[in-house]
């Protein structure tokens, strides 16, 4: 099917032709034949790199040309940013929405395409974004993640809510290959398009005894290292001019492999040296120093312990073919477009708490294998598993290469998932009686899949009972409605169980303590926590003794609850160190984490502190001011004494501390100093910016930003700028 013959807007056609795209891939042509450009719902379940983005683009531009508006839903913020850049180069207005979860973001409605995570879309629905009814097309990328225990329930509810709000809209689900696509397509009332076609031939095999066994042939691999099969496979690819991705089970393994690969590759490229220098800007941690040393020689590791900036540098260098090899945990396979000639799946067993080492699912193997082969760059792609012994070769073929993908299932019936979604349905006006609630849930993927809803109806009753007891929902006769507390909790996008614990504990306290508040938040379901090893317990116990007066929740008597308790305490200690202005490097060293971990924890608790301050403002006002100040301290990583200074735009933790140590403790004191004094402390650019806020020029028309504005100066050393 030729691009020239398609009913798509002429500007898009010319862009495709300019890029050398003259004919559709077979799966893309099948989508057009099934009604892609005629408003039909579609479920497209095809391999990675088979042209899903172009399928979505054609449909979106068709809608935009007809006056419509499109919503593109992704699972990850990083993928949202990637799609935002990609769609923005096609001559339409694109908006990106991944930020605060209590905002309506009405300005987004000015765009033709809005890109957002499923959590953000759920939040926009809860907060009543005015442009939602204008959406004529919803594209759900990675729709197979409806099976995810963490994110699946939210994605399922977003789809159900959008279909309820906009029954006439078109819906396109983009999926990896799954075992039960007909079931999912049936729920979506969608035409099903499946295919095994790929633009680059994928060869899947198992490595053992210096040979790769493919389905129909054997390929020898030169033995460079006697001890490391993964390294031999990697160097074999590089010798032929290709790049390599190596997937391993842990961060430690990823870093260890990158060091070995760097030692073998030994590149001396000036561009790589420049990448390494960029990584070392600021105050690098030991992890980042290791990464920079690897990058300088042509290899890298990639995992969630790195900051967004560091991951971005690695990804960019790999796309430019500067880096020859990346070793990664499976995070890299989840959505990011980073293909390579050969993908090595070294570790196909993963530790699972309570179950020991378990094989990864077929879907995860396929996600990783799908990264093999760069369209228009590689003649083929190879996905290679590594067998430890000869007997494993046929086993790995059977379990992964020849196996069917797993079915996807609804996760919405989990009681803990239902608490938040039942509350949002009631608070957002989707349901005003138990009957309407049941009727809405009867349209869920769960009920479609199981053909009955007895289990989910019982779970709904359990969730409602909790919400009524927690005073978030009231029931009068047959009517149910959200209370002021319930409405706020739904708007703030936190788990009702978190809100109940926070409000209850705050009401019990006579005296406020930052550490007590941080510890409380770290015990909630919304806050991920650090693993507490046995070796950590003495230090944690000492901290509890020393800071006992500031601890709100004492150790549990039940041994089964001890692990959860000490995880929360350890996380609270890390966050307390952050607000005590301990350097990022020392925090990473003390707690055995990476910059990305610290950033993630600060980002999470900062949102929960914001929600807590709003809960306190309405329901525990005696603590509101202190909690609001704690939120600012956490955002900037500062002690309270710096609060007056960081309210100025351009002043973060480093510059505020520098001013304070020079005897300048407030904006008032700062305004009394001469410009030349401030230049010595802050530098000329920031000094002028700060003075302009304190003494606005009459002829510039500039206004001082509102107190608490986010710092925009990239030189500030907070994790939010490193992020």
Swiss-Prot record:
Chain location of the short sequence motif DEAH box per the record: 141-144
Domain annotation Helicase C-terminal: ranges: 230-416
Bias type Basic and acidic residues, positions: 695-707
CDD domains in the cross-refs: DEXHc_archSki2, SF2_C_Ski2
Catalysed conversion reaction: Couples ATP hydrolysis with the unwinding of duplex DNA by translocating in the 3'-5' direction; ATP + H2O = ADP + phosphate + H(+)
Subunit structure: Monomer.
Record-given protein name: ATP-dependent DNA helicase Hel308
